[in-house]
Amino acid sequence: MSSYYVDGLLSKYTAGSSLFPNVERASCSIGPSGEDYGSARTTAAIAFAPSLSGVYSVSDAVYQSRPVFTSGYGQGQDAHTLHCSLFDQSRLFTDSCCHPEPGPLTSPPDKQYRMYPWMRASDPTRKRGRQTYSRYQTLELEKEFHFNRYLTRRRRIEIAHALCLSERQIKIWFQNRRMKWKKDHKEEPVSTPSGEKDCDIQPVSEAEEPKAVNNPERRFGVRNG
């Protein structure tokens, strides 16, 4: 490297006290409008352009376009206003969703809930349906009634589990069966022994009864002689 080139380069660097003599320290605080940061950035760009043009031989036209970047900072107030407006809009939308306007107490007929039969209140005057038992269940209950007309609680639980019925159903069935049994036996006539007939039984008259009492021999079978 020639000494002429080195001396010429050093003379350019030593011409000023610093490479960026007019650059000011930018403030870190951003005001509500954002203009402080934009003005500091604009000043730094203007001071930075002539210093570099002497070293790197860059035309000033390139650095004249630097303020394009500062135009965004100059609109800081509008940007903040736009951001706040979007936030306010979202907040208003959220409030309107969370706090709907009071409407009528009665909903339209097409939006009413569907009522199922099991959701309605039971009518006390309505009669319940009669419980039907299968043939196998009836046969087992009849067999149990033939041996025991009254069941203990333990036996009732066993039969209920065996026949897949409830204790209440077993209890009601036995109550009805006992009432039927009493009714059938109450209406049956008293049967007489098979060897006797109604015609063989003759009523004793009052005229013949004193003769048997007054004649002791005939009464006890005593014969004379």
From Swiss-Prot:
SMART domains linked to this entry: HOX
Compositionally biased tracts (Basic and acidic residues): 184-200, 208-225
Gene3D superfamilies: Homeodomain-like
Region (Disordered): 183-225
Residues annotated as transmembrane: none
CDD domains: homeodomain (cd00086)
GO cellular component terms listed in the entry, alphabetical order: nucleus
DNA-binding region, residue range(s): 126-185
Motif residue range(s): Antp-type hexapeptide: 115-120
Keywords assigned: Developmental protein, DNA-binding, Homeobox, Nucleus, Transcription, Transcription regulation
Keyword Flavoprotein: no
Gene Ontology MF, one: RNA polymerase II cis-regulatory region sequence-specific DNA binding
Pfam families attached to this UniProt entry: Homeodomain
Domain of life: Eukaryota
SUPFAM superfamilies to which the protein is assigned, alphabetical: Homeodomain-like
InterPro entries referenced in this protein's UniProt entry, alphabetically: Antp_homeobox (IPR050296), HD (IPR001356), HD_metazoa (IPR020479), Homeobox_antennapedia (IPR017995), Homeobox_Antennapedia_CS (IPR001827), Homeobox_CS (IPR017970), Homeodomain-like_sf (IPR009057)
GO biological process, one term: anterior/posterior pattern specification
UniProt main location, coarse: nucleus
Protein location: Nucleus
Family of the protein in this entry: Belongs to the Antp homeobox family.
Function text: Sequence-specific transcription factor which is part of a developmental regulatory system that provides cells with specific positional identities on the anterior-posterior axis.
Protein name: Homeobox protein Hox-A7
Classification of source organism: Eukaryota, Metazoa, Chordata, Craniata, Vertebrata
Gene (name only): hoxa7
